[in-house]
């Protein structure tokens, strides 16, 4: 059984109490032990570090931020009552516009925003401290630094560099290493001081920076974990397993599993991945014993009011819950049978015809007994 079995929700539904309660109940019913909620700019919605702008107090913004912290702390306490750990996930660095207006030297004509590592590591420290203090019941934070969604990436992806860029303005790996190391050290120290668990998500804006990021993480205390995607970039069945998963041997590794199907219609159409997922998870465990956790993403941050348990592709999420727990030895057929029985109250082996032809009414046209409409797990039949 995997040590960390996490369920993640990362769209606007995290602010809907009914939706997050459904997430918690789903996790409890299916053997998950960790809840992750997140958005790219989440931390900026929760706190505004003091002393960086002349606008020390904005009643509207402050009230909204405080309300969100109270809400998430309530969710963290609910998770604790259900025996679940609770993490927040976000992408940094992010900041409000007035920060640049108050520190105009950060605006560089050649490179856009100046990466003053002393300033930004201090800003990051104060922001993360505020998040931990505002939501004391949380277990830890999952942070991606310098992703394409951050306002201040340390390096840019190749597609974002045009022919007019001067070569001398491109940041070299040795320079990037120093920036990553300083920021990671700042994150590690502040999260540890708040008695929380830090998970660094290896998700740089440029894939060329992957080795630099891993090198900068290596000197950190072993209590800092890392999160790495199952495939090198996005998801497609033919993509290889991510070799970066094998490069971390001094700390726990959590593998990111995209079950929302960004590249295949977000799970709207059935997309069977059970055998593929089983093979990849077995590879993880055999290839690197430090891979101890998995984060199953149930949504995609750009599509609201949608998550995998409301689609036919839920079979993949259900299979993951089994494969990460005590069902690792089950076959795809057995896992599908279990899912159909739970979701539809239907046992395919009770019928002589094949499961999917029966489900579609193929064959002799005889009606199937019972109601095959999906049963809600969260309300009585």
Language model segments and positions:
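Aromatic-lined carbohydrate-binding surfaces of glycoside hydrolases
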Residues: 1-238, 264-268, 298-326, 358, ...
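Aromatic- and carboxylate-lined catalytic core of secreted/periplasmic carbohydrate-active enzymes
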Residues: 323-362
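A broad structural signal for short, well-ordered beta-strand segments within beta-sheet-rich domains
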Residues: 138, 291, 347-348
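Extended, compositionally biased alpha-helical segments that mediate assembly or anchoring
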Residues: 287, 292-293, 297
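Extended ligand-binding clefts on enzyme/binding-domain cores
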Residues: 212-256, 267, 279, 285-286, ...
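Non-catalytic positions within long, well-ordered alpha-helices that form the structural scaffold/packing
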Residues: 28-29, 285-287
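Active-site clefts of carbohydrate-active enzymes
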Residues: 97-98, 248-281, 296-300
């Amino acid at each position: 059984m995997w040590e960390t079995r996490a369920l993640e929700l990362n769209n606007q539904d995290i602010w809907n109490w009914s939706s997050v309660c459904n997430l918690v109940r789903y996790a409890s019913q299916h053997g998950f032990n960790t809840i992750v909620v997140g958005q790219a700019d989440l931390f900026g919605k929760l706190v505004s570090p003091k002393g960086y702008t002349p606008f020390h107090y904005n009643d509207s913004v402050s009230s909204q931020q405080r309300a969100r912290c109270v809400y998430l702390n309530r969710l963290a306490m609910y998770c604790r009552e259900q025996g679940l750990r609770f993490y927040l996930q976000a992408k940094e660095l992010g900041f409000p516009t007035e920060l640049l207006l108050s520190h105009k030297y950060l605006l560089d004509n050649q490179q856009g925003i100046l990466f003053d590592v002393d300033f930004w590591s201090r800003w990051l420290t104060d922001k993360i401290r505020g998040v931990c203090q505002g939501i004391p019941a949380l277990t830890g934070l999952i942070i991606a630094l310098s992703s394409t969604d951050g306002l201040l990436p340390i390096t840019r992806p190749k597609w974002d560099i045009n022919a007019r860029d001067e070569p001398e303005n491109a940041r070299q790996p040795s320079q990037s290493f120093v920036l990553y190391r300083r920021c990671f050290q700042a994150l590690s120290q502040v999260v540890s001081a708040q008695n929380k668990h830090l998970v660094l998500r290896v998700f740089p804006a440029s894939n060329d920076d992957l080795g630099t990021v891993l090198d900068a993480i290596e000197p950190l205390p072993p209590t800092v974990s890392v999160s790495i995607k199952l495939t090198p970039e996005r998801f497609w069945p033919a993509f290889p397993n991510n070799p970066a998963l094998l490069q971390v041997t001094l700390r726990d590794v959590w593998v990111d599993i995209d079950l929302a199907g960004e590249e295949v219609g977000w799970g709207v159409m059935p997309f069977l991945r059970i055998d593929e997922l089983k093979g990849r998870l077995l590879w993880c465990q055999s290839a690197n014993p430090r891979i101890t956790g998995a984060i199953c993403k149930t949504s995609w941050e750009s599509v609201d009011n949608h998550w995998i348990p409301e689609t036919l592709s839920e079979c993949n999420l259900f299979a993951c819950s089994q494969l990460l727990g005590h069902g690792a030895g089950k076959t795809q057929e057995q896992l599908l049978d279990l899912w159909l029985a739970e979701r539809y109250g239907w046992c395919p082996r009770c019928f002589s015809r094949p499961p999917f032809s029966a489900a579609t009414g193929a064959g002799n046209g005889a009606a199937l007994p019972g109601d095959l409409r999906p049963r809600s797990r969260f309300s009585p039949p």
